[in-house]
């Protein structure tokens, strides 16, 4: 019999009389023996079909496996359960009593005030229900549901603002309710478990669109594929043709991934008294002489304002703001509208400990890509087939990358 072990130093022919290749085989007492079987890595299961696995070890020794399925995004920590870290696409507040139950069924119709953007099969978490609806308990409603249909059963034209879920208990009466503080947090659109080859018959729900028209194939109605990498201890995941998401390992497996545009790009302590308010206005001007690098529409969180300025309280200034205009000449500054009551005088202040924390934003950061990778040496996150700066359409030939060691900084700079 051939000697135990594999001999691959030469070609298959030069290894004649030895074992050259094997699969799931070990050598025991000089003889080849197949493995005895498989054991489950984790006792629990995940939802959907896994299309991407990525494992890594943190500096602290934690062993993780990232799992991207056609339905969700998970992370597993050293044989523990799979933690659902699927990003939230949007969170909407419902109008008063917009949850409708029908006697004898577990199907509940929920209406949003604006378009929800969901597709059949998506997951949504309902919170804030303060009373039973048709006999369905509060705890049964305040949980994560899978959307089974869009629209109202009696009006299929309401697909953009209504959706249906199946609760774990049936209603004992027909009623509408929920209260005035109900929110619906929609996870990112789910994808298909199969490849769609064309845009013809059967690619959209029954009755969708006009007769004979084709249906566009996007990330929600095509085979769901992921690319997953680790950025140091953290994980970055990209839905093919979709957004790029970031999961921060330091916050734990109970926190979901967020869009790359929502991570912190820069946090800086500003010079003394950087905040100016104008009499009879809610517009504030904040000086960041170090150069903010922001554009209109970006968000910044201000903290550390020590007292009221021009009649506007510190609590109204120490908030997240949306930038309304920018001035890039020195000293650089930006403005934001904080709403509420106007300032009673023009004044400058804030103290010496004001901090501005900028999010990466959607202008420079890619919001759609085909794939992401990372350069191991300089640690650039590289987006392949992504949107251009300031745009939304995917350019299959465009390759962009972030600054070294800075996954939230994508602004191209001259060197």
Show where each model-derived region lies.
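Generic hydrophobic, aliphatic-rich segments that mediate packing or membrane embedding
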Residues: 49, 69-71, 143, 231, ...
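Predominantly extracellular/luminal cell-surface or secreted proteins
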Residues: 75-78, 125-129, 166-170, 247, ...
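N-terminal beta-propeller domains
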Residues: 1-91, 189-214, 359-415
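Small/polar beta-strand repeat architecture
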Residues: 3-10, 84-225, 251-368
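Short, hydrophobic/proline-enriched secondary-structure or compact coil segments at domain edges
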Residues: 65-67, 164-167, 234-237, 335-337, ...
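Elongated alpha-helical scaffolds
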Residues: 68, 221-223, 227-244
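Short acidic-glycine loop/turn motifs at beta-strand connectors
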Residues: 69, 77-79, 239-241, 249-251
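Active-site-adjacent structural elements in enzyme catalytic domains
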Residues: 230-231, 240, 251-252, 261-264, ...
């Amino acid at each position: 019999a051939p000697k135990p072990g594999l001999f691959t130093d030469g070609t298959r022919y030069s290894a004649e009389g030895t074992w050259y290749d094997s699969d799931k085989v070990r050598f025991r007492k000089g003889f080849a023996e197949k493995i005895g079987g498989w054991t489950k890595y984790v006792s629990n299961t995940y939802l959907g079909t896994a299309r991407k696995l990525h494992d890594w070890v943190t500096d602290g020794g934690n062993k993780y496996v990232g799992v991207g399925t056609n339905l969700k995004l998970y992370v597993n920590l050293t044989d523990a359960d799979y933690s659902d870290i699927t990003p939230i696409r949007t969170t909407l507040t419902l109008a008063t009593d917009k949850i409708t139950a029908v006697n004898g069924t577990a199907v509940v119709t929920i209406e949003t005030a604006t378009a929800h953007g969901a597709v059949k099969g998506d997951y949504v978490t309902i919170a804030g229900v303060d009373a039973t609806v048709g006999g369905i308990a509060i705890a049964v409603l305040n949980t994560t549901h899978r959307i089974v249909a869009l629209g109202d059963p009696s009006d299929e034209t309401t697909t953009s603002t209504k959706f249906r879920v199946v609760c774990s208990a049936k209603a004992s009466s027909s009623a509408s309710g929920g209260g005035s503080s109900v929110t619906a947090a929609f996870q990112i659109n789910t994808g298909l478990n199969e490849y769609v080859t064309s845009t013809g018959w059967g690619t959209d729900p029954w009755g969708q669109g006009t007769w004979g028209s084709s249906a566009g194939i996007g990330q929600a109605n095509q085979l769901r594929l992921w690319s997953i990498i680790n950025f140091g201890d953290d994980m970055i995941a990209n839905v093919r043709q979709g957004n790029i998401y970031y999961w921060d390992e330091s916050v734990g497996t109970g926190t979901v991934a967020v869009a790359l545009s929502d991570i912190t790009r820069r946090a800086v302590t500003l010079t003394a008294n950087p905040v100016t308010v104008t009499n009879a206005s809610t517009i504030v001007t904040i000086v960041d002489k170090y150069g903010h690098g922001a554009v209109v529409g970006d968000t910044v969180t201000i903290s550390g304002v020590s007292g009221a300025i021009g009649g506007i309280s510190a609590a109204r200034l120490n908030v997240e703001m949306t930038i309304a205009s920018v001035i890039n000449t020195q000293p650089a500054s930006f403005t934001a509208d904080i709403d509420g009551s106007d300032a009673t005088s023009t004044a400058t202040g804030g103290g010496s400990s004001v901090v501005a924390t900028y999010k990466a934003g959607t202008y420079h950061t890619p919001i759609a890509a085909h794939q992401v990778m990372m350069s191991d040496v300089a640690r650039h996150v590289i987006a392949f087939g992504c949107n251009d700066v300031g745009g939304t359409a995917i350019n299959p030939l465009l390759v962009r990358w972030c600054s070294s060691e800075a996954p939230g900084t994508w602004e191209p700079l001259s060197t």
